[in-house]
Amino acid sequence: MKNIRNFSIIAHIDHGKSTLSDRIIQLCGGLSDREMEAQVLDSMDLERERGITIKAQSVTLDYKAQDGQVYQLNFIDTPGHVDFSYEVSRSLAACEGALLVVDAGQGVEAQTLANCYTAIEMDLEVVPVLNKIDLPAADPDRVAQEIEDIVGIDATDAVRCSAKTGVGVGDVLERLVRDIPAPEGEPEAPLQALIIDSWFDNYLGVVSLIRIKNGTLRKGDKVKVMTTGQTYNADRLGIFTPKQVDRDVLNCGEVGWLVCAIKDIHGAPVGDTLTLARNPADVALPGFKKVKPQVYAGLFPVSSDDYDAFRDALGKLSLNDASLFYEPETSTALGFGFRCGFLGLLHMEIIQERLEREYDLDLITTAPTVVYEVETTRNEVIYVDSPSKLPAVNNIQELREPIAECHMLLPQEFLGNVITLCIEKRGVQTNMVYHGNQVALTYEIPMAEVVLDFFDRLKSTSRGYASLDYGFKRFQASDMVRVDVMVNSERVDALALITHRANANVRGRELVEKMKELIPRQQFDIAIQAAIGNQIIARSTVKQLRKNVLAKCYGGDVSRKKKLLQKQKEGKKRMKQIGNVELPQEAFLAILHVGKD
């Protein structure tokens, strides 16, 4: 056991986590050179296309150190994006140490900080690594100083390497073996294994990634899930070298995978503890704190025949992504679907793309909203995650919106622009600290403004240099109203949105104008209106298509023309009464882009 090292790699987006993982795998001979490819651990197509890590992946490697001993390295590559911070905290729970990778050109960023603090809170040994020293813009001494000033860990002898060229990666491994402690645990004690992650395989059922804290697990053992009390047979187990390799036993302190032929997706929940049926442990391991979704949106299949397939797909995805929440929902405009909860907009996009790609579904998404706290006139407090669930205006005593605490790190020259942006988003500044050329800003901004497009706008006002980390702080009373959209004087529930009264008129007008461009012209006039309660705040009309009925008249009497026009008018009127308007998918996406341009 003393030769096992469990560690994660944490870093801000694009600081080179996945490339460093590649080099480590190559150095330890986990894959032959022929099988090696760039970003070996980003196995999803989506991850490769966007160049981001979404799922944490684990690998077991053997490393022969300079002291002649062979060490077993279990390491987990984690995502850097704020929306996937839950993946990071789960990975860290399985480790004794973490490599903090910092880009020697860009320096410390907000996400580096957030993930690093998570690691320190969990009592992990943090080893700083300065990556990308081969870049002309690299300034390792300045960055080492920054790590000490901002993060507060000693970085004077931080390892310097370049994951791309492979320089200094050997030193990283030596430092790892030296500084990160070996796992603690009792090989003879009853088995306690933590489920870090699980996913669904069509042939094997549920595959779980586990970390053995105490005891040992052998092939063929009967294991028991501690929260549900169900027992399963350990059919196959092994490790990833990134390839799946079968083993007969997983020892204390190791990280590996386990297949128990569990067909039910909720059979082995993530964060649960496995133990042996014949000799169970007394207590479960502390799991992970459940994350609360911050953004909700309705997802509906385009054709209602796909509903069952959609439900199964969501079940399988939520097994793999424990932070996804979903419940059934019906909408008059869109039929049956699900109300899903996400950690942020990127998370929502990724889930939607994964559903469309991996499960071949066509989906319509409604506008994302956050959770509001409503105190009704009966003094009940309810939580509303969808505009259609909001009670009528006269039943609401107080509406409170969620406030997010945003920590931003940015170079000084962009300070003015970023502060202007925060004020525009109704933000309140709570703190500002200068570290050398960097400024650390703390603002309290309504969550609805943050999840809509704050991140994109922040990046564009600061030319990509500012970084953001945010978390829910509290609910605060605010003057929010629901804006309804009426097409042909029928309310379309899927298009309603909740917004601040000050922005309601502008948002309503923008939305109505946008819808006007997207709804195809019909044989009759279509009125599109935005309303707060019964008060109409904006309107536009999609003009009808009409045939030129006078084309066949040459000169002649005006009453003849009037008769033809009158006849056409009556026809149009009749059409308008029975006609209904098909709304295209783009119309629902229009809400997402209101206020972007």
Swiss-Prot record:
Biological processes annotated in GO: positive regulation of translation
Reaction catalyzed: GTP + H2O = GDP + phosphate + H(+)
Gene3D superfamilies: 3.30.70.240, Elongation factor 4, C-terminal domain (3.30.70.2570), Elongation Factor G (Translational Gtpase), domain 3 (3.30.70.870), P-loop containing nucleotide triphosphate hydrolases (3.40.50.300), Translation factors (2.40.30.10)
Location(s) in or outside the cell: Cell inner membrane
EC number: 3.6.5.n1
Pfam families reported for this sequence: EFG_C (PF00679), GTP_EFTU (PF00009), GTP_EFTU_D2 (PF03144), LepA_C (PF06421)
Entry keyword set: Cell inner membrane, Cell membrane, GTP-binding, Hydrolase, Membrane, Nucleotide-binding, Protein biosynthesis
tr-type G domain span: 2-184
Domain of life according to the entry: Bacteria
Membrane topology (UniProt): Peripheral membrane protein
InterPro entries: EF-4, EFG_III/V, EFG_V-like, EFTu-like_2, G_TR_CS, LepA_C_sf, LepA_CTD, LepA_IV
Annotated binding of GTP, by residue: 14-19, 131-134
Family: Belongs to the TRAFAC class translation factor GTPase superfamily. Classic translation factor GTPase family. LepA subfamily.
Protein name, per record: Elongation factor 4
Lineage: Bacteria, Pseudomonadati, Pseudomonadota, Gammaproteobacteria, Enterobacterales
